[in-house]
Amino acid sequence: QLGLEVAAIDEEKARQYKAAVGKGVVITQVKSGSAAAFAGLREGMIIYEVNRVSVNTVSEFNQALKESEKTKKVLLLVKVGRYTQYVVLSLKP
């Protein structure tokens, strides 16, 4: 629904994306024209939270997303460069 794919951060991805192993999930793909693309999310960004719930695995990320199907909005805490910021995405019905 968001138009993105994520992966857990293992040692290889931690080196590749300058991230901590097991802390957050990394965006590996963003579909053009999707809610994620519209919000400015890009490959390589790290997602630490979904709706203020910490996510460190793909299954935690997916579970947290399921919780937001009712509200049709998703609040992500994302690492952008050296900083973190909140990004709001609207889910398509």
Predicted regions and their residues:
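C-terminal recognition in membrane/secretory proteostasis and scaffolding
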Residues: 1-93
